[in-house]
C-alpha cells in the first residue's frame, strides 16, 4: 500500500469534511486555509455563495502594524481576533468551524481559540 503525501491527505480530509459542514445565513461557515507562510480565514454564507468577511496575515490592516508577520501561532491568533471582530460588526455571533482538512492543532487551533475569545461561538 502506497503512502499518500501530506497534501493529498489534507485534501482527502477536506473533501470528507465538506460533505457535512455547510453554512447558511443564520450560521455561516468559518473556513481556514493554511499555507507554509500565511493563514487565511473567511466567514462564508454557502446558501448565497457569498463571503461575509475575511482576514489573513497578508491583510492590509495587519501589514500596517508590521512589515512581515511570522508564520506562527501568535500571528494566527491575531488573525482570529481580527476576523471575529469583523464578523461581530456584521451581526454574526455563531459560526460553523471548517478547518479545511488541516489537523486541529497549532496555527489552526490558535486561530480558533482567538476567535472564540473575541466572541464567536462554535
Curated annotation (Swiss-Prot):
Any one cellular-component term (Gene Ontology): cytosolic large ribosomal subunit
Highest taxon of source: Bacteria
Signal sequence interval, chain numbering: none
One annotated GO molecular function: structural constituent of ribosome
Region entry Disordered, spans: 1-21
One Pfam family from the record: Ribosomal_L18p
Subunit description: Part of the 50S ribosomal subunit; part of the 5S rRNA/L5/L18/L25 subcomplex. Contacts the 5S and 23S rRNAs.
Function (record text): This is one of the proteins that bind and probably mediate the attachment of the 5S RNA into the large ribosomal subunit, where it forms part of the central protuberance.
Protein name, UniProt field: Large ribosomal subunit protein uL18
Protein species of origin: Prochlorococcus marinus (strain MIT 9312)
Amino acid at each position: 500500500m502506497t503512502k499518500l503525501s501530506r497534501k493529498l491527505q489534507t485534501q482527502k480530509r477536506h473533501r470528507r469534511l465538506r460533505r457535512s459542514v455547510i453554512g447558511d445565513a443564520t450560521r455561516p461557515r468559518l473556513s481556514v486555509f493554511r499555507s507554509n507562510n500565511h493563514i487565511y480565514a473567511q466567514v462564508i454564507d454557502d446558501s448565497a455563495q457569498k463571503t461575509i468577511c475575511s482576514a489573513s496575515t497578508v491583510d492590509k490592516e495587519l501589514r500596517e502594524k508590521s512589515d512581515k508577520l511570522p508564520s506562527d501561532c501568535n500571528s494566527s491568533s491575531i488573525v482570529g481576533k481580527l476576523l471575529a471582530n469583523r464578523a461581530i460588526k456584521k451581526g454574526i455571533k455563531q459560526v460553523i468551524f471548517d478547518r479545511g482538512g488541516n489537523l486541529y492543532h497549532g496555527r489552526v487551533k490558535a486561530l480558533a481559540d482567538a476567535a472564540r475569545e473575541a466572541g464567536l461561538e462554535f
